[in-house]
Amino acid sequence: MAKEELLEMEGVVNEVLPDTRFRVTLENGVEVQAYASGKMRKHRIRILAGDKVSVELSPYDLTKARISFRHKDERPAGAPSQFRRR
């Protein structure tokens, strides 16, 4: 049996919730609750409020999503990073 087709959309993270969950507003205006994919957690990719992300939605439950990709910010090459390394 084949896997179901996932709906891929883009959105912006509005709020960081407890337990590595996020409230994301999709490009069509719908707000969903999303979680970071396993590979994003494994590689410690940080997701903050205001980040543009790609999400995958199941056709069976359109209120929950998985964040599959965080798009890079459009910053000039010489601009300082938001975080300092320790």
Swiss-Prot record:
Its main location: cytoplasm. Disulfide bonds: none annotated. Pfam families: eIF-1a. HAMAP family: IF_1. Belongs to the IF-1 family. Component of the 30S ribosomal translation pre-initiation complex which assembles on the 30S ribosome in the order IF-2 and IF-3, IF-1 and N-formylmethionyl-tRNA(fMet); mRNA recruitment can occur at any time during PIC assembly. This is Translation initiation factor IF-1 2. It comes from Aromatoleum aromaticum (strain DSM 19018 / LMG 30748 / EbN1). The gene is infA2.
